UniProtKB/Swiss-Prot annotation:
This is Small ribosomal subunit protein bS18. GO terms for cellular component: cytosolic small ribosomal subunit. Part of the 30S ribosomal subunit. Forms a tight heterodimer with protein bS6. Keywords: Ribonucleoprotein, Ribosomal protein, RNA-binding, rRNA-binding. Binds as a heterodimer with protein bS6 to the central domain of the 16S rRNA, where it helps stabilize the platform of the 30S subunit. SUPFAM superfamilies: Ribosomal protein S18. It comes from the Bacteria.
Length: 76
């Protein structure tokens, strides 16, 4: 009977001592968006609630300013 050991998730923003998430930092934001364009939940990424709220706001601002797409490219 095999038991799987699940690795402890940690908050990347806490480890790097980030004060505020910037909507212009697209490389960071892209890491928290699925390939369909949805925001990945914190239970998957391990992000703390404070940073998850900042992340969602930053992604929504970047989408509004056309820095990030709302959805995927639909395979054209």
């Amino acid at each position: 009977m095999a038991r799987f050991f699940r690795r402890r998730k940690f908050c990347r923003f806490t480890a790097e001592d980030v004060k505020e998430i910037d909507f212009k930092d697209l490389n960071t934001l892209k890491a928290y968006i699925s390939e369909t364009g949805k925001i990945v939940p914190s239970r998957i990424t391990g992000t703390k609630a404070r940073y998850q709220r900042q992340l969602a706001t930053a992604i929504k601002r970047a989408r509004f300013l056309a820095l990030l797409p709302y959805t995927d490219s639909h395979g054209r």
